[in-house]
Every structure is written in structure tokens, then in C-alpha cells.
Amino acid sequence: PIEDNELLEALNQGALLVRNPSARLAWSEVDEDLLLFASGNSRLLSGHLRELLRNICAADALHVENLQPWLSDDEGRKLLCELIKQGSLEFADE
């Protein structure tokens, strides 16, 4: 599993996160929260991650510039690490 500091270090060194071609990602609003569906798993997230989920679900590749607002957010970093761990996101060189 990837840790927060490893994620930040890799992205700051120019690594690119890409969606696994077989990953299925979608999200829905639930009151003020968000429900993320990722490769057969679901997770309830706070509403402030709405734009991050839009980026993750819509983009094939995520640059550090696209992720910067959420890299300083504990929940945002944790989500990215979990999506890498489950194989929905991966580094482009893998």
C-alpha cells in the first residue's frame, strides 16, 4: 500500500496518475455528502471532495497541478491512496 508521503513525493517528482483502463468509477450526491463507486466498492465522502471526484472520474490522467488543492487535504490524500491500493488508479510508468 502507498502512504501519503510516498504519493506526495511521487507526484512532486512528476509522476502521473492514470485511471486503470478496467476501472469503473462513478459518484453520486447523497444530501451534503458524496458516494463514490470504484471498481465494485463504494465509499461515502464529504461534499468538499466533489471537484476531486469529478476529476478522477472524468480524466484519464491526473497531473499534480490537477490534484494540488486536495493533496493538502487529509481526506483527499487518503482517497487517492485507497484508489491506488485497490488498483483503480496507478502511476503511468507501472
Which sequence ranges carry the predicted segments?
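Acidic, low-complexity/disordered tracts enriched in E/D and polar residues
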Residues: 1-57, 81, 92-94
